């Protein structure tokens, strides 16, 4: 049994139940089931079979989910893409791309153009269920990592991992009863794709919005009780709510992951949207690692929640040996349902995974992150965490957003430069003095106003782009 079998079950047992709710339409489970069977016929006619790896680039979320589900049911490996990823560098050889755009996609194999009639093909309702993947440990799905500090990695997942991720993800959502999940992360991300399946595979509704105002209106209109988002989504929703205060009384829980939640944002979200916030930490390779209610986290900067019982985690020092509780070092994790970097091979799923974070684990299992190893700023006699400085700037008067980066110098060391989005004039010296008062090591060389702080789909700052903006005339 797999998640598509559950979708097909609900298509039969509760066909009128709302499966997907969009700003302009509602799709029932019955329609999802019919769509999957129809698309299976179209996929076979396109001469795609389990020997192929297929990229999926479809903007319409409903169609995207249906096509991926049909491929999965047929035992065909898929990877969701935006169309700009360099898959070959990540170790992925794609045989074809199913796209709703009639344009060339270099290195993506042959183009299979998605047509409207894919969803209206005749099929044999009595046909035997497809055999699917050859076994539960075979490669079934590829997810691209965020690539915030390096090139995106292609993470391979077996059918067993895909199914178990859905189950473990559900276990993080037990703080409140819910039936309608609004899922804001994109489906090309592990967070977005997994969250949508955690709703649909259990017979719940997945609600998708195109903007912050859409999200607020749809929560109110459809009685959404669970919101899945990253901090950037919540930032825009709070800003929109400030202009258009749409009540959201049905919201019972907000799950936030993908990036650290700025301390100044917490009271705004709790006052305007929902008081109960579940904070989570995960990675594309490992899945959920830690989670906890905001009340246990908000007073501990950098805390991400308590380690999940299905996770082995250690903090290691420079000698790669575990350090005592509450001592900072590099994080490594290992889970039963771990994906693997395709360039390393399937055996990598059995080894420790190093997500690139610096942090500590308390005696009671609270995971606290200081920052990213790759983002640490080399000041010569010490390393500075840009994330800690950004947390201090959260809520600074007049600042909308801020990004701290290390700017390389001829000496081999780095200077601290800051890009900010602001309302009104910015007093550069005041910001420098504010940070220096917080920490005498935080000696900022430059503060520059930017029109945008570039973030990826998970809300994480793309620091390479920030450096380019700061160096631009």
How would you label these PLM feature ranges?
Residues 163-180, 188-226, 240:
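Conserved AMP-binding/adenylation subdomain of ANL enzymes
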């Amino acid at each position: 049994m797999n998640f598509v079998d559950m979708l097909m079950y609900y298509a039969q047992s509760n066909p009128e139940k709302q499966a997907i709710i969009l700003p302009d339409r509602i799709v029932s489970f019955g329609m999802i089931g019919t769509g999957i069977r129809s698309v299976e016929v179209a996929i076979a006619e396109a001469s795609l079979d389990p020997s192929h790896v297929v990229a999926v680039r479809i903007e319409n979320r409903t169609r995207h989910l249906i096509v991926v589900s049909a491929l999965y049911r047929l035992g065909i490996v898929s990877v969701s893409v935006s169309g700009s990823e360099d898959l070959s560098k990540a170790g992925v050889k794609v045989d074809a791309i199913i796209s709703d755009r009639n344009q060339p996609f270099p290195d993506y194999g042959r183009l299979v153009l998605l047509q409207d009639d894919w969803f209206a093909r005749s099929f044999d309702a009595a046909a035997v269920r497809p055999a699917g993947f050859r076994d539960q440990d075979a490669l079934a799905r590829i997810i691209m990592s965020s690539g915030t500090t390096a090139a995106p990695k292609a993470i391979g997942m077996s059918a067993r991992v895909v199914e178990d991720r859905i189950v473990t993800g559900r276990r993080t959502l037990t703080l409140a009863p819910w039936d309608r999940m609004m899922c804001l992360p994109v489906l090309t991300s592990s967070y977005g794709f997994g969250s949508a399946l955690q709703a649909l595979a259990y017979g719940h509704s997945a609600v998708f919005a195109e903007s912050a105002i859409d999200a607020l209106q749809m929560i109110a209109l459809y009685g959404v009780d669970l919101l899945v988002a990253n901090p950037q989504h919540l930032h825009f929703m709070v800003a929109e709510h400030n202009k258009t205060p749409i009540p959201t009384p049905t919201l019972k829980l907000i799950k936030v992951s993908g990036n650290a939640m700025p301390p100044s944002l917490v009271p705004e979200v709790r006052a305007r949207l929902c008081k109960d916030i579940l904070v989570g930490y995960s990675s594309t390779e490992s899945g959920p690692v830690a989670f906890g209610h905001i009340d246990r986290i908000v007073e501990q900067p950098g805390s991400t929640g308590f380690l999940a019982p299905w996770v082995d985690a250690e903090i290691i020092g420079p000698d790669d040996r575990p350090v005592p509780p509450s001592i900072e070092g590099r994080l490594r994790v290992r889970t039963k349902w771990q994906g693997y970097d395709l360039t390393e091979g399937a055996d990598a799923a059995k080894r420790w995974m190093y997500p690139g974070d610096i942090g500590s684990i308390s005696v009671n299992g609270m995971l606290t992150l200081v920052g990213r190893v790759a983002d640490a700023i080399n000041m010569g006699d010490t390393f500075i965490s840009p994330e800690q400085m950004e947390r201090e700037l959260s809520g600074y008067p007049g600042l909308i957003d801020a990004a701290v980066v290390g700017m390389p110098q001829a000496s081999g060391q780095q200077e601290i430069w800051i890009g900010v989005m602001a309302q009104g004039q910015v007093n550069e010296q005041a910001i420098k003095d504010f940070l220096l008062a917080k920490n005498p090591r935080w000696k900022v060389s430059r503060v520059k106003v930017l029109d945008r702080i570039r973030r990826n789909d998970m809300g994480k700052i793309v620091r390479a782009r920030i450096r380019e903006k700061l160096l631009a005339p």
